């Protein structure tokens, strides 16, 4: 039996600690980002796949606990798939191509940052199969596998001519990368590993530059990526003057200035501090308000140093990439 990325007890503990004021539907994404950072999954080449697996495991846990309905989760997945394909595809299902009624060649929708066609995926599958000593798969069998995997979902089906051979054509399916990953998951373990890496690389090469996050879960996801860029940020995030807000008094030697981090990810500084307090990461009251709790300091996510600034006691807090 395959070992899960995180245990049910770890999921339960993370939800209890960090989602007190969060709507249930936002919990899977937020807790998945929490594990991506704390377990350093963001350093792996298949981090996008791991993030999706984490979300699925957390959703399953919430369904088991009665906090989410299966129908609600299924509706959200369908809505997400429709949104991803709707941005780039005029989605419709056409009648299957048959030899009795040859269909004219149709231009295949080109690959974008969100889509890939079955011919490109089939080529990648057969290259991986060849390297692993497995036989190649024919287009008709591959299309059957795709149709079975994507049953009830949105995708584009078209036809392409067999070169100069008149009257002969074959089906081509254009799908999202998320759907392609599920098709790839049907391959053997060795082939699957190679495919996932190649799909990730192809998607990143075709994806547009990331936009400023609009929600807190998106900001947490970006935090994992920013941790990898720490060395470049260190030179730019030096503390300014002594008489600035608490966050701007944080020195940056081995981490990220919390106030500047909020600006980088497009959040208001006070909103970020408020969320960290509400979720039990920072102290909420007293002289040590906004100071990280000891368990997060011990885990290496923050470093704290007590200093004196203009005859006032203060704290230097660094958000580390651990």
Curated annotation (Swiss-Prot):
GO molecular function, one term: DNA binding
InterPro entries, per database record: Ant_C
Function comment: Antagonist of the C1 repressor or repressor bypass function.
Region forming the signal peptide: none
DNA-binding stretch(es), residue numbering of this chain: 258-277
Protein name (Swiss-Prot/TrEMBL): Antirepressor protein 1
Top-rank taxon, per record: Viruses
A Pfam family per the record: ANT
Keywords (A to Z) from UniProt: DNA-binding
Record organism: Escherichia phage P1 (Bacteriophage P1)
């Amino acid at each position: 039996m395959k070992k899960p990325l995180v245990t049910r007890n770890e999921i339960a503990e993370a939800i209890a600690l960090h989602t007190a004021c969060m709507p249930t539907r936002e919990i899977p994404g937020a807790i998945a980002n929490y594990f991506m950072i704390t377990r350093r999954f963001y350093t792996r080449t298949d981090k996008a796949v791991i993030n999706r697996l984490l979300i699925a495991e957390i959703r399953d846990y919430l369904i088991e606990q009665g906090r989410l309905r299966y129908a609600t989760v299924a509706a959200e997945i369908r809505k997400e798939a429709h949104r991803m394909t709707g941005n780039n595809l005029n989605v419709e299902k056409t009648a299957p191509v048959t030899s009795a009624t040859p269909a004219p060649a149709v231009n295949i929708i080109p690959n974008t940052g969100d889509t890939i066609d079955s011919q490109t995926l089939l080529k990648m599958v057969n290259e991986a199969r060849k390297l692993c000593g497995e036989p190649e798969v024919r287009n008709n069998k591959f299309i059957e596998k795709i149709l079975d995997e994507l049953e009830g979902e949105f995708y584009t089906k078209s036809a392409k001519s067999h070169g100069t051979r008149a009257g002969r054509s074959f089906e081509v399916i254009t799908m999202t990368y998320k759907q392609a990953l599920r098709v790839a998951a049907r391959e053997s373990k060795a082939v699957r590993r190679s495919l996932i890496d190649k799909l990730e690389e192809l998607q990143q090469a075709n994806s547009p530059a990331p936009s400023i996050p609009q929600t807190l879960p998106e900001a947490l996801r970006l935090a994992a990526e920013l941790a990898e860029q720490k060395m470049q940020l260190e030179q730019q995030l030096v503390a300014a003057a002594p008489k600035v807000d608490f966050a701007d008094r944080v020195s940056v030697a081995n981490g990220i200035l919390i106030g500047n981090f909020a600006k980088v990810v497009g959040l208001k500084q006070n909103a970020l501090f408020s969320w960290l307090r509400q979720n039990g990461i920072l102290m909420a009251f007293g002289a040590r308000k906004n100071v990280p709790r000891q368990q997060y300091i011990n885990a290496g996510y923050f470093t704290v140093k007590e200093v004196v600034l203009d005859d006032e006691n203060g704290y230097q807090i660094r958000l580390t990439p651990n």
